[in-house]
Amino acid sequence: MKFLLTTAQGIEDIAKREVSLLLKKLGISFQIEEKPLGIEGRLLLEAEKAYYVDEKGRKRELSISTYLNENSRLLHRVIIEIASEKFNGIEKDESEEALKRIKDFVSSLPVEQFVKVSETFAVRSFRKGDHNITSIDIARTVGEAIFERLSRFGTPLVNLDHPAVIFRAELIKDVFFLGIDTTGDSSLHKRPWRVYDHPAHLKASIANAMIELAELDGGSVLDPMCGSGTILIELALRRYSGEIIGIEKYRKHLIGAEMNALAAGVLDKIKFIQGDATQLSQYVDSVDFAISNLPYGLKIGKKSMIPDLYMKFFNELAKVLEKRGVFITTEKKAIEEAIAENGFEIIHHRVIGHGGLMVHLYVVK
């Protein structure tokens, strides 16, 4: 069976490693391709069936999609792939021609193998690129094709609000994917513990990628600008054995982080401190690792303050950091100057897609 797995752009390799480790526990054969057909933020998984023995000793098939939905920290969606196609030139096609190509393709697919006529269905769509059609156009066209195909076998049931089966259609540049979205309408990165929303909160998937890149060894971990606590909470949920510390300047966000940690059941695992990261050495004498989503200045409209903020922060960080730091920001020039000026070395850099922005991730020591 084939699955299309979605994640954040720029962390495909880390997500692939996580999925590989999860599937190895099942003892099955599988192959994972990063960026299938050149599309970032996607993995293509082909895996054999997995089985388990129930309490009565009977052999049962294990749902790989359910297993990944329940255990992955880095994936956004788990989609059973029906088919994919490269539509050369579709970005230049007029809307009528583009939609016809999509409808003809979907009409040729055996969608009846993935949904019963007695089951309700809906189509959710995603589009990225320069096209003359919208995601709404795609959802409507794919829905029509599926409805017409299923009509050969009975009367199809459409339920746009609470469907039993969700078809997911994606058109990214000139590549089209169609599959069954087993994750549902809410992406996996939207954690159920998030009861307080910081205006610039970090996706949990990216937080986990940062944790992986830190290569933690059980030492103390600090988020010096912890916001709503995403990194700290995700780390605590891993049952991390080391000390976990969060510093946040604004009381409103600190209380929000504590509310989130309480909802996640890990409040007792995290030490929260109200404080200013530019005076870091007043709160901690030393820390092994620092991981943080630094302020970009975009939400508050104060980008001019960022270079000075970063310079002061890294000056303080140099006094307490023992091993490695992992940081993301949109402000490449400001952070690189602060890193160099305060004696740190960049040992890894990559660009990640986050909330419509391309952010820079740095691992420093």
UniProtKB/Swiss-Prot annotation:
GO molecular function: RNA binding; tRNA (guanine(6)-N2)-methyltransferase activity
Compartments, record wording: Cytoplasm
Name of a matching Pfam family: THUMP
InterPro entries, per database record: RlmKL-like_Mtase, RlmKL-like_Mtase_CS, SAM-dependent_MTases_sf, THUMP_dom, Trm14-like
Transmembrane segments annotated in the record for this chain: none
Enzyme class, first EC level, given as a word: transferase
Family membership: Belongs to the methyltransferase superfamily.
Domain free text: Consists of an N-terminal THUMP domain fused to a catalytic Rossmann-fold MTase (RFM) domain.
Designated name of the protein: tRNA (guanine(6)-N2)-methyltransferase
Species of the source: Pyrococcus furiosus (strain ATCC 43587 / DSM 3638 / JCM 8422 / Vc1)
Gene (name only): trm14
